[in-house]
Amino acid sequence: APDIIHATTWAIPPTSKPLAITVHDVAFLRDPDHFTAHGTAYFHRALEITRKRADAIIVPSQATADDCVEAGLDASLITVIPHGLSHTPVTDDQIEDFRARWDLTRPYILWVGTREPRKNLPTLLAAYRQMEDADLDLVLVGPAGWGSDPTDAPLAPDRVHVLGRLDDADLACAYAGA
């Protein structure tokens, strides 16, 4: 049997064991309109469970630690441990193959995330439109989320590439090729 349970997300299991919880952010408190009502309620319940039951709280940054303290979590339980990094070596041939498969012939700006309101994609797209003279494409990687998807609107098809979710190998190539 485990000596400790580590909940790496807000999906906190019931347990009588010591409990460590990773809190990636508390954005639902700062920008509740960027979440569904169901999502906001879920996160509030998880925050309350964290407040009552956590024996240790892991956060990725000092900013998140400060937000957690402001949200009522015990500062003495919080430890900052930055998110890890996975270095996947990518060859020039792999990048060339990736770019050819996705018809990426020009240099590009890469955005990776879930396409949903809290990611503020409309602002990125508006900024990109102001760069129309730049010889840069915009590559959007990641799945559609909830709410309106700004990529449903007409985009410059030869300059804005919506790739959707990529496997790890292609994602590494997308980063390396940007």
Residue ranges and their predicted role:
Residues 1-178:
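Carbohydrate transferase catalytic cores enriched for Leloir-type hexosyltransferases
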